[in-house]
Amino acid sequence: MSRLLLGLALSGVVSAQTISMQAGGTQLTIKRQPLRIAIEHNGAPVAGAHSDGGLLLGNPDHPEPASVVSESFGDNGRRVLTIGTSSGKSARIALTVTAHQIDFVVQPSEPEAVLMRFAPASPGFGLGDHAVVGRPHFDTDITGYSNDRFLSGQGLSRMISNFVIYPKQKFAFLVWEPNTKIVRSTAQECTQGSRRVESSVRFSVFVGTPKEIYRQFLESRNLFGYPVMKPKYAFFGVGWEAFGALAWDTDQKTVTENVDRYLADGYPLKWMVVGSGFWPNVENRMHETTSFGLYDPKRYPDPAAFIAHFHSKGLKYLQGLRTTFITDGPYSAAGVKNNLFVEEAGHAKVMKFGWPKSPIYFLDWRKPEAVNWFVDLVHRWTSFGVDGYKEDVYGYGKYGLGDDKLDAINEALMREGQYIMGRNAYLASPADLHRVNDFNYDQNQDRGPVNALALAYSGFPLIYPDIVGGTFGEGHFDLKVTPRMKTYMMRNAQWASVHCSMGMGQGPWTFGDPQVEKVMLAAAQLHDRLQPYLYSQAIRFYLEGYPWTMAPLPVAFPDEEGAYGRENDHVRGYEWMIGDALLATPLYGNDYESATARDIYLPSGVWIDYDTGKKYQAPTTLHQFALPPGKTPLFVGGSGIVIEKRGADLVARIFRVNGNGQTTFIYPDGLAKSSIKLNVADWNHLRVTAKNGGIRKGAWKRNAFEFVITPGENYEVH
């Protein structure tokens, strides 16, 4: 009896009708019949109870609401509820309440669907690639979304997250389930669940500010087996992809000529990808990235020298990589013999994906011995000098494979220091970049920005928006150069330049227009200058979970009404914060050919036009603000401190927006830091002192006061 009373005192209060638990400012209230869940934070309601029941069991298409039958405490001291339905379905729920997170681990008495349901909330954001699949309009607000078979492979959906954040209400919600899920965020309900739980399933609700929510989400991802891994610096520079420049049929000569032309024209390339065509060409059984270590002798007669050529120019060299093995390929027999592929009825299952064209076996990612075998095979590529891989498994939708089908492999490669451009993932981030699905000239151009922002909301903010201009060699569209195509190339390059990474493809020189060449080169050079700043934000994401590289305005400014309702194909207000100082405002969308201006929302504070230095007091909307091709789509605000490259140096650029701003910059090694603090009384007479007592020289350039910074040193500007 005394143990029970102590448990009640520490963990909550039981009354005839309710169960209440509290930690910090977070309170969970559960009503018994039917079980209804309500959550408050700091005295304000965040997630409301659904009147028809908050926990449902049984048939996934006709689940039943459950009620609380009894309460107890587990061996770990956690509150445990026994619940049941009117038809006799039952389950146990283990509850954990902390200051910013509530976990519900549900264990049904038999395999069945388990759903958690709250009252409707809006607007909501997230859902990864699913945010742009099967919806009537492109919009980051997922209100109205309902999918009772939420799984990768539905259309272009490969980067998968069912994390949904409601910034106005100050909560986020998900079920941790790599298999088929139920996800609804409608005018009637906020519901998530698993269609079939074999043993147990976890639901998490995060509460607080967006920074608090994303930090808790990060900690849980790392704790529950969905790790966020540390990205690497080179991938945040300007790159080049053979698929964009040369399509599938690559060879040593044309790749070398194309990359060397870009370098000669002043493009600051830091990485490159040859995604296909390097394998032996004669036999179809070799036509896949799993020809490990075997190059076509005519197309790539000296792969080691070929790769070394690019290393000598400072580029990281990557190849395409999939976990699909052509059934009669060079390594498939060993995989079958050792039971390393996905099986059916005790035999390796033969499948047919979108690529390769031949029947394949698929590596069983759930077996550690299969992952180790695959990584050992990858070393056959690494031995030639390959630095990493563009992961691009696709076309598997009809097989119902788990969303996490590539995570273990990519994690193992990342732990070896390989560069990974990720395309498939579930909640985890075992990659340096999160690639938006193939994005081409012939497609609706609102998909790209909505897709990128949706990924950022969902915990995937290391956005690579695919190849600038897309893939001209696939035959998807007429290659005739038109004024529309020229405008597209300029707009696409400028939009890409303010993401974590940008990759060149079709040569700017092929359009026969000096303006196109000038604008595309300027976009690449802008991205190159910002590479250290972008990477610093990526490391902050890795450490804190918050999407510092691409923070949508509803996340960065959740209490400002003007931040909402803009990221859609009607308003086309595609804006986001980069770090604590830059606001990206690219003019993009399906009206790119005719649009020359946008309504730009500036959140609270002082903002400066990056190009002109003109100052604006906000919050305000700049109606029909001119953004012609070539205008840098950036404003500076917040801390007012931006780190850029200047030749071989890194410089802190201080803009006149906040005399008391401060920031911490993380260097390209991902470890060293510098803090910069402003204490400005007179902008016309600035002095920079280092903490070691030294004085740094600075000068006004391009609307900002610049001075060189060095790793490990801290600075004050006054």
Each model region followed by its residue ranges:
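Extended, loop-rich substrate-binding clefts of extracytoplasmic carbohydrate-active enzymes
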Residues: 60-104
